[in-house]
Amino acid sequence: MFTKCISCCGLAIISVFFACLFVENCAALQKTLRHYEIFHKDDVVHRVVKRGAKHSTNPFNTIKEVEFTTLGKNFRLILHPHRDVLHSKFRAYAVDADGNETVVHMDHDSFYSGRVFGELESSVRAHIEDGTMTMSIHLPEETYHIEPSWRHLPEAKKDTMVAYKASDVKVHKNEAGATPKTCGYIKEGLELEDKEHGDTLDNELHTREKRQSDQYEYTPTKTRCPLLLVADYRFFQEMGGGNTKTTINYLISLIDRVHKIYNDTVWQDRSDQEGFKGMGFVIKKIVVHSEPTRLRGGEAHYNMIREKWDVRNLLEVFSREYSHKDFCLAHLFTDLKFEGGILGLAYVGSPRRNSVGGICTPEYFKNGYTLYLNSGLSSSRNHYGQRVITREADLVTAHEFGHNWGSEHDPDIPECSPSASQGGSFLMYTYSVSGYDVNNKKFSPCSLRSIRKVLQAKSGRCFSEPEESFCGNLRVEGDEQCDAGLLGTEDNDSCCDKNCKLRRNQGAMCSDKNSPCCQNCQFMASGMKCREAQYATCEQEARCTGAHAECPKSPAMADGTTCQERGQCRNGKCVPYCETQGLQSCMCDIIADACKRCCRMSINETCFPVEPPDVLPDGTPCITGFCNKGVCEKTIQDVVERFWDIIEEINVAKTLRFLKDNIVMAVVLVTAVFWIPISCVISYFDRKKLRHEMKLIEWSQKLDLIHPSDERRRVIHIRVPRQKISVARACN
């Protein structure tokens, strides 16, 4: 009886332990998500439809229908296999402790893209393996994410998945209540002269200059950046669950979602210019370290056993790998937790011909090592020490690639760091973003301008041309006249045939699937609305012309129309409130007025709050950080950013701004400039005085009594022989 009681007590204790562990994991996930649901893979219905009797390698030959219910919504997904992000020479390898590579064979057909049934403006990116799904579902009003439960809830039932909305992702705060930095970035080295390719590059540049009297005439034809993805042993164990294929599939799915962000971006200098789009990524090689690397010769290795790494040191060690030269970019994925909650680091690209860092960079020599600075890294461990969710991983990786492509952090100006009421922060914001605000997955105008210059200058060196542009992907490419996607490949579209040609013999003038001003295969009547009004940019709604299938450029709003931040439209641009009053916009430097709208008479005048007082929206930059409910809250400075900015481009204005923003360090620096030389002089005289005193002490102990100052006086030593005295014995 006693033994039975002991057994029951033991089982109870074990049950309580695992229950507490599960609750702890749930609580950890609740720090990241406001709400989530768990469902089993058996709750998902899969249906596969074969398109024809003949086998075809066309990805649209097979349609997979997936249906399930979660988060109060029924999802019916229409999916097809796709390999957009896999290079034709794609290879994946598992690497052991001695560096031996083993080829890993992958099922490329487990990656899907598609749409939600009945939702015209929807898109889906998914990976399905043994019924367990990792996917992102984009709808006009919300984005849904699904991923395996084990990644965040180790004690959850096997074969279950976590579902959550993008709007339920929390923005993390650090101990001081500020939003932590997403990453740092590095500008390494100065201009390097690549003698071997100098003449070739000069000719290339000269030819391009002649071709680019208008810079918008040049559109890159090589649009894919080949990637090397490396997972260290920590990432393999934590995010891959100790399974090589799971790790590889996670990375492919991640890059697939990041590729969509880039591929849909129009790289332009100004909104009234066309720019170019379709720039993205393709994975050429994946390396997964299944165990820590054994060190040889005492050299540090990015995959060695080390509990704590400085993030910058880790990136530099990773950049020593010779194989990086064969790729556009190399990226390391780790599960290390870095100081300050940093989630990533990358070298910044530059449009200058021989600068190092970012895409298509020449090699760089530093401290006896050859570095390949087309690199970056991301961590899957946030500042809480928890694994990042899919949404966070997407944004962090996209952010680091943005640095590699040439963008620095968005400056604190309204154009590139708008408030939440104006769409929120953009992708390249210094601090982490939730991913829910409309701008969080977009590049700011500042980033667009920077990256565009780098792409035009360097993409031709190491990018590759798209290998699979095929009929049926809803994109009009090459000699296609239209592309109706899924319906078109079944020859069921009334405007576009299965060969992506317009059905002109049936009177088709355009395709409803590809042109906003096309309806029933005909140009829409003149005056039909095709684009909504944009008050933030002072653009009216656009209407079809009746003669073309494309939506024309939006006309400017009438002068005097109210636009963002109480401004007014003038000549098609939103003029800030202060300028409409004949004043200049500025930022009050008095804390009490820091979150009020302020103006000044001229550039050298003092800022003053307008009357009646106008409190700035939450998220607006202020003198020490960002406004929150009318109070200017201090945030952490991005020291790495400012430091490398100054080294890269030293000028008086930037130096003064740096000193002003870092007043404590400035005081220490200025004090040191004066104190160190003075200390050296004082120390010199102290030592001289000490030597003099030591000589005096030494003189006082001598017998010749010659003062040290009498150096010219000669001392003559006279040796006097002593007389020997003999003692005679008397003999009696």
Curated annotation (Swiss-Prot):
Q: Cytoplasmic compartment: which residues?
A: 684-732
**UniProt GO MF annotations:** metal ion binding; metalloendopeptidase activity
Q: Which residues bind Zn(2+)?
A: C183, H399, H403, H409
Q: Which residues form the signal peptide?
A: 1-28
The places in or outside the cell where this protein is found are:
Membrane
**Locate the Peptidase M12B domain: which residues?**
223-467
Instruction: Output compositional bias ranges, type Basic and acidic residues.
Output: 196-214
* Main localization, broad class: membrane
Q: Which stretches does the entry tag as region Crambin-like?
A: 598-662
Residue pairs linked by disulfide bridges in the UniProt entry: C225-C328, C360-C462, C416-C446, C530-C551, C569-C578, C574-C586, C588-C595
Q: What class of enzyme is it?
A: hydrolase
| Region feature (Disordered) | 196-217
Q: Where is this chain glycosylated?
A: N100, N263, N492, N604
The record lists the membrane-crossing segments as: 663-683
Report the EC code(s) recorded for this entry: 3.4.24.-
* Membrane association type: Single-pass type I membrane protein
Those parts of the protein on the Extracellular side are 212-662
Report whether Lipid metabolism shows up as a keyword of the record.
no
**UniProt-listed GO biological process terms:** commissural neuron axon guidance; membrane protein ectodomain proteolysis; negative regulation of multicellular organism growth; negative regulation of reactive oxygen species biosynthetic process; Notch receptor processing; Notch signaling pathway; positive regulation of programmed cell death; tumor necrosis factor-mediated signaling pathway
Motif Cysteine switch: list the residue ranges. Answer: 181-188
Q: Could you tell me which InterPro entries the record lists for this protein?
A: ADAM10_ADAM17 (IPR034025), ADAM17_MPD (IPR032029), ADAM_Metalloproteinase (IPR051489), Disintegrin_dom (IPR001762), Disintegrin_dom_sf (IPR036436), MetalloPept_cat_dom_sf (IPR024079), Peptidase_M12B (IPR001590)
Question: What are the UniProt keywords, alphabetically?
Answer: Cleavage on pair of basic residues, Disulfide bond, Glycoprotein, Hydrolase, Membrane, Metal-binding, Metalloprotease, Protease, Signal, Transmembrane, Transmembrane helix, Zinc, Zymogen
Check the record and name the PANTHER family matching this protein.
Answer: ADAM10/ADAM17 METALLOPEPTIDASE FAMILY MEMBER, DISINTEGRIN AND METALLOPROTEINASE DOMAIN-CONTAINING PROTEIN 17
Q: What name does UniProt use for this protein?
A: ADAM 17-like protease
State the organism of origin: Drosophila melanogaster
> What gene is this protein a product of?
Tace
